[in-house]
Design a protein with these regions (language model features):
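Short phosphate-engaging motifs
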Residues: 71, 146, 202
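Class I S-adenosyl-L-methionine
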Residues: 2-141, 149, 242
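Class I SAM-dependent methyltransferase SAM-binding "motif I" and its flanking Rossmann-like core
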Residues: 46, 117-190, 234-235, 284
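Residues at the C-termini of beta-strands that transition into short coil/loop
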Residues: 68, 89, 142-144, 173, ...
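A contiguous loop/helix-start segment that scaffolds small-molecule binding in enzyme catalytic cores
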Residues: 2-39, 95, 106-110, 129, ...
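Residue-level signal for well-ordered alpha-helical positions
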Residues: 77-78, 153, 209
Length: 284
């Protein structure tokens, strides 16, 4: 039977109309009508930081395909007895996709469980399109990302009035590179709240580049496995970022949060200021 589902990503890029079978469902819809595979964000690590929708998808799964190198086993254990568990740390996309397609075509509820949020460094597009090519729809369940968990653990805000109003999520170039316009030097020039994933292996060059654009005493939060039982989190001056990382032997599951906001927590937002009017609180 010919596929009736088209890749929504290709349709956008090629300016084609989307097939109704893969149109994005309204946010209020708790159960996607056409989906047979759910790509679910597991959040930063702690099971109680799952969204309710993510937890429900996992508990209802017949097949759980999960990133066992990054997702907490406690989260995978939420799946029902009898659920087929497939660990993907040693598999390629060419091995994972056919498995999901096979199970979904049998009418089973398949959950692809990713760490953090699937929309960030989650190989999402190739999975969505690969499933669509096989006539299988997808729904994506967001997850809390490491930068949010880190800011929460620090009890801090990343957007401070008069200091910084922009958050940048990126990574060091590394083996796979980044587009030239998004190199770290260009991003650092913004002096925004800069959240760096997948960068611990390159911390020396990262620090060198950042010091060209941020003061050397700019606070840097270094977070390792934030929200896991073995979480380690410390704020250090930018000039010590590499040394501390290397002392701790951090090479993976590490987030760097570089931000002037970490040093300016006393500033007040206008949102609740008596002098600030808005639609719901007009001038008195």
């Amino acid at each position: 039977m010919a596929s009736t589902v088209s890749c929504p990503i290709r349709a956008f890029v090629q300016d084609q109309p989307l097939d109704p079978a893969v149109m994005i469902q309204p946010a209020v819809s708790p159960t996607p009508v056409h989906a047979t595979v759910s790509i679910v964000g597991a959040g930063p690590g702690a099971p109680d930081l799952l969204t309710r929708r993510a937890e429900n998808r996992i508990k209802q799964a017949d097949v759980l395909v999960w990133t066992d190198s990054l997702v907490s086993p406690q989260i995978a254990a939420l799946a029902a007895d009898g659920c087929e568990s497939v660990r993907t740390s040693t598999l390629t996309l060419e091995e994972v996709l056919p498995l999901m397609i096979n199970r979904a075509q049998k009418g089973l509820k398949v959950v692809r469980l990713h760490d953090g949020d699937p929309c960030l460094y989650g190989a999402l597009s190739e999975q969505v399109c690969g499933l669509a090519d096989a006539g299988i729809g997808v729904d994506v369940v967001p997850g809390i990302s490491a930068y949010q968990a880190t800011a929460s653990a620090l009890k801090t805000e990343l957007t401070i009035p008069g200091v910084v109003q922009t958050i940048v999520l990126s990574r060091a170039g590394g083996r796979t590179g980044v587009p030239d316009a998004e190199n770290l030097a260009n991003l650092a020039r913004l002096q925004a709240s800069l959240c760096l994933y997948l960068s611990a292996r390159h911390v020396d060059e990262v620090q060198t580049t950042l010091l060209e654009h941020y003061p050397d005493d700019t606070p840097v939060a270094i977070g390792y496995r934030v929200s896991w039982p073995d979480q380690w989190l410390q704020v250090v001056p930018l000039k010590d970022m590499a040394r501390v990382s290397q002392d701790r032997k951090l090479i993976r599951t590490t987030l760097y949060l570089v931000s002037p906001a970490l040093a300016h927590q006393g500033r007040r937002s206008l949102l609740y200021s008596p002098s600030h009017d808005h639609l719901f609180r007009p001038h008195r």
